Amino acid sequence: MRGKRIDFKKACWLVFAIALLVRLIVCWQLSGTHSVVSPSDVTDMETYRRLALEIRQGHWPAVFDYQPFYYTLFLPAAYVFSPKGGVWPPMLLQALVGAFTCLLATHTAARLFGKTTGIIAGLLLAVSKFHVFYTPFLLLEVWFAFWTALTLYAAVRLMQKFNWKWGMLLGAACAGALLTRGNALLWTPGLAALILWRGWKRRKQMAAVIAAAAAAFIIPIAPYSIHNSLNSNKLCGASVAGGKVLSLGNSPEAPAGGLEYPRTYYAWAEDEAAGGKTVARHILDWAKSEPLVFLEQKCRALLLFWDATEIPNNVSIDVDGKASPLLRLLLPWSILGALGLFGLLVCGWKPRASRLAALWLALAFWGSTSAFYLLARFRVGFLPVLCVFAAAGIVELCRRIVQSKRIHTPRARNSLSVAAFALLFSIYVVDFAHDAYCQDLMPRVFRSLRPQGIALDLPSERVVYDHGPLGFGGGVPLELDDGSHTLGKSFRVKDGFLSESPVRQRLLLRVHHARRQFAPPGVTLRSNGEPLRPRAYWHTERSAQWLALEFTAPVRRTEDFEIVLDERGLGVFIDLQRNYGRSTLDGEALPGEWVAELVLDR
């Protein structure tokens, strides 16, 4: 006798109710936190709030620097209920949007893999820690997840029932996603290709679908693009910050994750603003000069995308989420990421149009996000897609386990073994792979790809160093014991930087817990065995504190410095993700490189 079937409609509304209740409880628990009530002026949250209130008063910005949906449409509409910018209207509306996103994930997974999978997908998203956590904050992540879920749902429906109505919904969803976050533009080529492939034998129907999708995509974007173009005197999209954002994750100094503003970011942005080379042109030139380094950076970003590590920005789940006991009980990325990757591996590769649409959106989101730079909140929009495939993976694993018990054949056992291997591989990628690469392989990789370290030829200065990114790299402070210590650091200077005549130079050494209220420590400095008389001072740059040693000397191909420090409580940073063998402490080789830079005046 078969068991009673689940009432799918009731199950969907149950998913919606659970999702909404969980989000409302977390909103209530976090409603008194500083980041909700009074976010810092330097955060995107306060910027969005300020812009929305100004727009409600009729003061529109000259250009839309950020993607404009959130602060030109959503927040002004939410503040109708609280003209002074109260916290509860946006929170309540974002809780509803999050719950509807769970409903969309449920229906999408049901159409792709069956109703049981759909219910599991909705429940996974309903209790996803990161999706719930961002609900109370004035950040666009919940909305971006909604647009991603709607894009996936519309694409699946269009592939299953090819008509202009679903094409129009798909175009509108892509427009909403693009107006919320710019990397959604990179989804569209694959979706357009799927439309052509699906409708190739029905040309008239395909033309209607393309026309409807294009109109629904262009019409919402056009007013913002026209506004930006008129005020910038050049053709622009809905946002004018694309070049700056692209440069944050695509430069010789850029980390794969974290928000860091290296020297090249400012130099390239200033060059573009002055009418010189565009940021895109700078990136292409650099990629041509160091193709393997560029490839390594992008592959590392692709790997980091799946990593369970949170890269906080604006808010941190470990800090801002402490006030919510419920949040600690929800599913973290380490579980959902592993299950989602597993589902992609075992369920995503079937040649059906609807499955291909889901697979494309998953791959396009992964690639388009990794093409820029990674923060924890950038992955929130991926969670609906992730939960759909996670649910499919769970159901498929259960099916193979049952099949292996019922059918004792080598094929059934092999099928289960493949699934088990895919699950273990997914767990390794999400929880261990990135750290293992950075700790064990990266020093050797960079010793091979970039043997001389980084050499920057900037308009105002030239810089040579061996360490990696400051914010999301391998830098750790090494506390020096009391007494005198000799730090050895060697630089390899490229030919174009050499000078026989004296040049003003600065040797920067990143320090920790420096007592800035006192004078810098006594320093003895030697270069290639010759004593120098540097001017020592504390220096703050790129959100880091440095001990600067300024002197004038010729620039040689090999600069071997010996820095003798005598200072209590001074920590000096060492980067364990780089090891060229060019750093020593008291004559002994270190397992990394000092975070030190040689800056040469032009």
Label the model's feature ranges.
Residues 88-89, 102-127, 145-146, 160-162, ...:
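Transmembrane-helix signature of polytopic, membrane-embedded enzymes
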Residues 66, 70-71, 89-100, 120-155, ...:
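Multi-pass, polyprenyl lipid-linked donor-dependent membrane glycosyltransferases
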Residues 20, 125, 169-174, 212, ...:
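Transmembrane alpha-helix segments characteristic
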Residues 44-57, 61-85, 92, 96, ...:
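Short hydrophobic/aromatic helix or loop-helix immediately within or flanking a transmembrane segment
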Residues 116-119, 154-175, 204-211:
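Short hydrophobic alpha-helices at membrane interfaces in multi-pass membrane enzymes
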Residues 4-10, 161-165, 198-212, 319-327, ...:
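Membrane-interface helix-loop-helix junctions at transmembrane boundaries of multi-pass membrane enzymes
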Residues 57-60, 69-76, 257-344:
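Lumenal/periplasmic acceptor-binding loop at the mouth of the active site in multi-pass
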Residues 15, 19, 26-61, 209-274, ...:
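Juxtamembrane membrane-water interface segments immediately following transmembrane helices
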